[in-house]
Amino acid sequence: MKIGHQFHTVALVGRSNTPGIAEPLASLAACIAKRGFEVVFEADTAQALGSTGYPALTPAEIGARADVAVVLGGDGTMLGIGRQLAPYKTPLIGINHGRLGFITDIPASDMQEVVPMMLAGSYEREERTLLEARIVRNNEPIYHALAFNDVVVNRSGFSGMAELRVSVDGRFMYNQRSDGLIVATPTGSTAYALSSQGPILHPQLQGIVLVPIAPHALSNRPIVLPDDSKIAIQIIGGRDVNVNFDMQSFTALELNDTIEVRRSKHTVPFLHPVGYSYYATLRKKLHWNEHPSNEEDDE
């Protein structure tokens, strides 16, 4: 068993628009408070649930006051609060109340048993990297954003291919005609990048992966770069091109706009139950190691 720091103040964050989430959140809050921990709620979560009987704090207030945030929802909920709490180094515990759950790894059915043990110091800790991006137009930055999973440049559904000029560390890599380009962290390598035939990067691997989306030339392949790389993507052709960050914020781009992407100085601490295995998560979520059907055996 790995014993870490015991926490005192615990923030609860939920996917507030999800039906049926109020009861498990209230139950978890009572379970944690009963064991002597101070409980606070993220403000939007508290507002959606109505009166919780606990203090309601903004993400900035959680960062300043809470020792740890427990997130009940899907991966999207974890991504959103992770970006907001990244400057404060607030550790996150993820409880899966969504569908896939690559980064919310505790089943909701186990939370009342597992979470109190973790809050008491029995957990495994890892740091996850983020990307920071800015859009430059006419030599002036017009937009900044953090991304936990990925920065995605893509065309709209009814426009033609985007034409992109990609440089790394000031050196020209290629011009690409495609539906877009994904710049992903190791965490994001199991998201959109994976569905576009990108490689899986272990979360502790120091890398950034570039994955073309439906490229015109079959020779355009994914590439893994060192995570200190500085990536520049210039729009040199196409129309209705957009950029999104974790699929949660979107910005329209113009011809000659440049998206500059690099590793953020911030990392997000993830806490896992003792015995956590990333490979077990992959095996379960991607259905690895499943046996052939009996029908195949009978042939």
Curated annotation (Swiss-Prot):
Enzyme kind, highest EC tier: transferase
Residues the entry annotates as binding NAD(+): D75, G76, N149, D150, R177, D179, T190, A191, Y192, A193, L194, S195, A214, Q248
Location within or outside the cell: Cytoplasm
SUPFAM superfamilies in alphabetical order: NAD kinase/diacylglycerol kinase-like (SSF111331)
Gene Ontology, cellular component aspect: cytoplasm
Keyword list, A-Z: ATP-binding, Cytoplasm, Kinase, NAD, NADP, Nucleotide-binding, Transferase
GO BP annotation list: NAD metabolic process; NADP biosynthetic process
EC number: 2.7.1.23
Catalytic reaction annotation: NAD(+) + ATP = ADP + NADP(+) + H(+)
Cofactor: a divalent metal cation
GO MF terms held by the record: ATP binding; metal ion binding; NAD binding; NAD+ kinase activity
Residue positions of the active site: D75 (proton acceptor)
Function recorded in the entry: Involved in the regulation of the intracellular balance of NAD and NADP, and is a key enzyme in the biosynthesis of NADP. Catalyzes specifically the phosphorylation on 2'-hydroxyl of the adenosine moiety of NAD to yield NADP.
Family statement drawn from the similarity comment of this UniProt entry: Belongs to the NAD kinase family.
Protein known as: NAD kinase
The encoding gene: nadK
